[in-house]
């Protein structure tokens, strides 16, 4: 983002979308689409950029429209500051968006990595680039599907 770039409205977690969820039951947390936003430049308090309503991913109710406005400061929207190299991790059930970028002397740059459970994906399958892959390696490259998936368990190696 360059100075003067307008923000992006607050979204996520506001209506039922089967890809945007956060659930904790029976000792396990489950969530839908997740994002890791790797900051390539410093973002200081008051700069703008990524903002969210902390804890909103756990809400069972749609926030009031007044709470979703970035124009009126009701104290619900928090801009996240981070140094270059930091990673902000959140799931799409979190109400989030982007505040207008204010600094004149630097741009905002970040790389977003998006992940989802295997049964929920917006992309197609990838071809396995490994020559003679193991069944476990092939499982990583399977196309998204819900039933009959191979479950990979962590194994210690020496």
Predicted features and spans:
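Conserved double-stranded beta-helix
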Residues: 1-51
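Residue-level signature for short turns and capping positions that connect secondary-structure elements
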Residues: 7, 15, 57-58, 95, ...
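Non-heme Fe(II)/2-oxoglutarate
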Residues: 87, 94-158
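Double-stranded beta-helix
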Residues: 30-35, 42-99
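Short aromatic-enriched loop/helix-cap "lid" or pocket-rim segments at secondary-structure transitions
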Residues: 5-9, 48-50, 62-65, 122-127
């Amino acid at each position: 983002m360059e100075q003067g770039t307008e923000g992006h409205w607050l979204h996520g977690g506001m209506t039922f979308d089967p890809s945007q969820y956060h659930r904790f039951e029976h000792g396990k947390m489950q969530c839908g689409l997740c994002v890791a936003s790797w900051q390539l430049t410093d973002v200081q308090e008051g700069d703008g950029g990524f903002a969210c309503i902390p804890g909103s991913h756990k809400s069972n109710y749609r926030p009031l429209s007044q709470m979703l406005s970035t124009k009126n400061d009701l104290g619900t929207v928090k801009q996240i500051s981070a140094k270059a190299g930091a990673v902000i991790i959140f799931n799409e059930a979190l109400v989030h968006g982007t505040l207008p970028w204010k600094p004149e002397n630097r741009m905002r740059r970040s790389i977003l990595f998006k992940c989802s459970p295997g049964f929920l994906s917006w992309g197609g399958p990838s071809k396995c680039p490994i020559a003679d892959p193991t069944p476990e390696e092939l499982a990583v490259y399977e196309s998204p599907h819900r039933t009959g998936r191979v479950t990979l368990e962590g194994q210690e190696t020496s």
